[in-house]
């Protein structure tokens, strides 16, 4: 009983949605009780109700809230108003979040559950698995035991608007993009929860965004690849240039890396989809940022991308900087201070005064050689 948002182009006022998105809600009918797994964004509440009416749903006993974020919980007040007597089933932490976000909810609207607790619908049973920090601290998953269907909310999701939830034509790219943008900071926690998912052996995985996975082994195999510590012989160059100096440096670096056998991708930060960068960060061994000094600091666009790099906590092994300046150089210092989460190695950065000259170009070539040597040292070349 989902709602498809064909027109939404931005999530959290940050993440581009080139393919739109969907908010997946699932209705389960047992012999004695009924349940609704998650709701939809409040802008799409009426679509949810239209779908429930189409199924002639007259009564809902339980509304499962796997996650408090409003794209899944925002219709809760309207749902319990439409279906008097319906109880919101969630964990204690999520209950607190929901009451913060929607003050009209009160304690009497809730049933709280603990890890592995079950609720019977008669001939069907819901079991709950707490999964803190698989995105948010209150996240949980719901398992329909008899049918072996897992409802993991954002886990295994994808931002894509499609007319058929079983359409797997472009699942890989949308799933990787979603993982990269939203789930990758929690990579180590996801490793543990992958073990939980394998232990219950679902026949189907039904996330709260995007495609339903009728072949769980496929998407779980992708996640296994993305969460492991291995990186690839791949360097991404992130540059911003006001008067072509940093562009020249970035292009020369890209050519030098390619000549030394390092697969390379160049991003002009003045016009970039951050989702594409996030996807590349899942695999890249090396990241190099090229940015000029602006008002005694790093260019703000470069600073914002470096901030995101730090927040995403990628498994990148090597990082370096090329910074431009004329009368004062402060970009390097400010950018280097913005990556406390980076646990890899900083390759000696460079400073370029004005347009890159012969000595600068030679130093850039030496940086490319250093990157290639580092890649060889970890056996990816």
Where do the model's predicted regions map?
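Active-site neighborhood of phospho(di)ester-bond hydrolases with catalytic His/Asp-centered motifs
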Residues: 37-39, 60-68, 88-91, 150-154, ...
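Short acidic active-site motifs
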Residues: 75, 273-277
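Short, charged N-terminal beta->alpha structural module
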Residues: 238-260
């Amino acid at each position: 009983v989902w709602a498809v948002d064909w027109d939404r182009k931005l999530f959290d006022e940050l993440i581009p949605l080139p393919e739109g998105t969907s908010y997946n809600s699932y209705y389960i009918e047992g012999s004695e009780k009924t349940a609704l797994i998650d709701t939809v964004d409040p802008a799409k509440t009426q679509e949810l109700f239209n779908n429930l009416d189409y199924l002639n749903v007259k009564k809902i006993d339980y509304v499962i809230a796997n996650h408090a974020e409003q794209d899944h919980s925002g219709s809760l007040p309207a749902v319990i108003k439409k279906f008097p007597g319906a109880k919101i089933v969630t964990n204690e932490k999520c209950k607190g979040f929901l009451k913060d976000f929607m003050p009209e909810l009160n304690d009497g609207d809730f049933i709280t559950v603990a890890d592995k607790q079950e609720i019977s619908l008669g001939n069907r049973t819901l079991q709950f698995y707490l999964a803190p920090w698989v995105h948010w601290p209150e996240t949980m998953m719901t398992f329909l035991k008899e049918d072996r269907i897992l409802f993991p909310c954002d886990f295994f999701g994808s931002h894509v608007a499609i007319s058929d939830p079983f359409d797997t034509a472009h699942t890989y790219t949308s799933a990787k993009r979603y993982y990269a943008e939203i789930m990758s900071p929690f990579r180590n926690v996801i490793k543990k929860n992958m073990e939980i998912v394998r232990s219950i052996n679902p026949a189907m995985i039904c996330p709260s965004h995007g495609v339903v996975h009728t072949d769980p082994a496929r998407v779980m195999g992708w996640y296994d690849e993305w969460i492991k510590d291995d990186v690839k012989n791949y360097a991404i160059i992130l540059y911003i240039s006001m008067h072509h100096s940093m562009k020249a440096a970035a292009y020369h670096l890209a050519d030098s890396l390619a000549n030394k056998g390092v697969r390379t991708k160049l991003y002009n930060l003045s016009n970039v989809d951050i989702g594409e960068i996030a996807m590349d960060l899942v695999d890249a061994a090396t990241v190099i940022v090229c940015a000029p000094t602006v008002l005694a600091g790093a260019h703000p666009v470069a600073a914002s991308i470096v901030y995101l790099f730090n927040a995403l906590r990628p498994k990148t092994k090597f990082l370096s900087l090329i910074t431009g300046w004329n009368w004062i150089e402060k970009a390097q210092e400010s950018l280097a201070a913005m990556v406390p989460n980076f646990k890899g190695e900083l390759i000696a950065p460079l400073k370029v005064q004005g347009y890159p000259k012969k000595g600068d170009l030679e130093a850039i070539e030496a940086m490319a050689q250093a990157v290639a040597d580092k890649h060889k040292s970890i056996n990816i070349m």
